[in-house]
């Protein structure tokens, strides 16, 4: 069934576009016929660390308060169950180690958790930029990531990790549109703060990559608007641990027998 009459009124976001790419039925349950969501370990964990980093940069927590806040609030904030004890322990320890010696590259950023509203063509978009900072006269967009991304390999043929990096960069390229409007210049760099691995991954801004991201966004919106088949993409790990609707997904429930 086509839902273009509903979809035409959407304000878009990067997460809304990727939700459809990951699973059309997840998109359906999230945005067309909204259902309640269940807590998930990975998203709860990422949200909690984002919150602590924001509080540190906004001055609501000082450096020597970070670990105590993390330890006393972890189980209240990270409600979803981890896939296994090893993953829980690994994530917990990596978050703790990051906060013990948090070395954020821009301790006095221009903006933290900066909301932006903008258009691509005639399509309205919204988003939250984790950090906007200046390096001299240059603008930097930084995204805090719980995912352990890898720096670009530099190989002639892109690796799987290079392609994954490019996928995540699309979000920051879209955010560069309102940043250009606000600061009258595009960012000089796009960066990921992969806090679990304590690695900053910088990427120089490229206008051709921006145009590619804009084209991807508009083509994805067109695909969603015309879509009539909302069948799921069934993958055990993603359905069980990454989908916040799997507890009420008929397809997943049938698979459980």
What are these regions (language model features)?
Residues 1-257:
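RecB-family 4Fe-4S metal-dependent nuclease core
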């Amino acid at each position: 069934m086509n839902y273009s009459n509903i979809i035409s009124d959407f304000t878009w976001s990067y997460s809304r576009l990727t939700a459809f790419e990951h699973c059309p039925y997840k998109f359906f349950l999230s945005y067309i016929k909204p259902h309640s969501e269940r807590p998930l370990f990975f998203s709860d964990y990422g949200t909690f660390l984002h919150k602590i980093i924001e509080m540190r940069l906004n001055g609501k927590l000082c450096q020597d308060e970070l670990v105590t806040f993390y330890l006393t609030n972890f189980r209240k904030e990270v409600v979803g169950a981890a896939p296994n004890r090893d993953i829980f322990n690994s994530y917990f320890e990596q978050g703790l180690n990051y906060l013990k010696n948090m070395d954020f590259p821009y301790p006095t950023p221009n903006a933290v958790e900066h909301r932006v509203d903008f258009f691509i063509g005639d399509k309205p978009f919204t988003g939250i930029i984790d950090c906007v900072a200046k390096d001299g006269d240059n603008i930097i967009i930084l995204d805090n990531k719980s995912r352990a991304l890898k720096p670009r390999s530099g190989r002639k043929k892109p690796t799987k990790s290079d392609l994954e990096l490019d996928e995540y960069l699309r979000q920051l390229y879209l955010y560069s549109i309102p940043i250009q409007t606000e600061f009258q210049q595009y960012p000089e760099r796009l960066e990921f703060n992969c806090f679990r691995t304590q690695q900053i991954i910088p990427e120089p801004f490229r206008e051709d990559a921006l145009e590619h991201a804009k084209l991807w966004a508009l083509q994805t919106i067109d695909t969603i608007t015309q879509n009539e088949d909302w069948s799921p993409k069934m993958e055990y790990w993603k359905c069980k641990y990454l989908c916040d609707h799997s507890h009420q997904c008929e397809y997943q429930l049938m698979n459980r027998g």
